[in-house]
Amino acid sequence: MALPDFSMRQLLEAGVHFGHQTHRWNPKMAPFIYGERNNIHILDLSQTVPLLNSALKVVSDTVARGGRVLYVGTKRQASDIIADAGNRSAQYYVNARWLGGMMTNWKTISNSIQRLRKLDELLAGEAQGFTKKERLNLEREREKLDRALGGIKDMGSVPDLMFIIDTNKEAIAIQEAKRLGIPVVAVIDSNCDPDQIDYPIPGNDDAARAIALYCDLIARAALDGIARQQGAMGIDVGAQVEAPVEPALQAPAEGA
């Protein structure tokens, strides 16, 4: 595998260059702004391209050395896309609500994850010994915990890198990452503060098509990292994803 490719045309078609209304801008974004049209800031895609490439490389490199990447996007138009990207690339995600202390108070979060696992076990069986009402209450508790923590249930500890959609909405997540020294990759729109972000990607953070494009590229970069890690461990990645080799073709390899 290799880092995912993308073109300037794809960025344009997804509306990555459209910022917010000019009166809503953050002056710190001035270096990333190309101009304005109809009172809307236009972001400079000639900067987005190399910065997005750098972000994809850091995601791939992090995963290749066995690191974990946490995707964060809780706004309505990002929620499903973030979860899909996390699942597809064997990474982790928060897509409902960022709970304060999710990273900085990992011990408490771990206890809640243990409770979620326990509920999974209880409800996977027949849940014998519970009344209908008790079972319903357990299901509700499980649903609430799964919504908040399902995407990080198997993470094991704090991540090595975070990828964020909407730095204003996810300000608490960024603060916690900074406190723990976790590097942050994030899309920065014209109303964002780029100073907080280690690997900024100047672009629209509201349009569903733009969000889908970023998440697809980040997920594919993570998959590239997995392939590189497995290659370094001597695992034949092709054998895992391709159809089984014909027995007749295997014979020479066995004798080699």
UniProtKB/Swiss-Prot annotation:
InterPro entries per record: Ribosomal_uS2 (IPR001865), Ribosomal_uS2_bac/mit/plastid (IPR005706), Ribosomal_uS2_CS (IPR018130), Ribosomal_uS2_flav_dom_sf (IPR023591)
Biological process according to GO: translation
UniProt-listed HAMAP family: Ribosomal_uS2_B
Protein name: Small ribosomal subunit protein uS2
GO molecular function, one term: structural constituent of ribosome
Cited Pfam families: Ribosomal_S2 (PF00318)
Gene name for this UniProt entry: rpsB
Covalent S-S links between cysteines: none
Signal peptide: none
Organism ancestry: Bacteria, Pseudomonadati, Pseudomonadota, Alphaproteobacteria, Hyphomicrobiales
Gene3D superfamilies found in the cross-reference section: Glucose-6-phosphate isomerase like protein, domain 1 (3.40.50.10490), Helix hairpin bin (1.10.287.610)
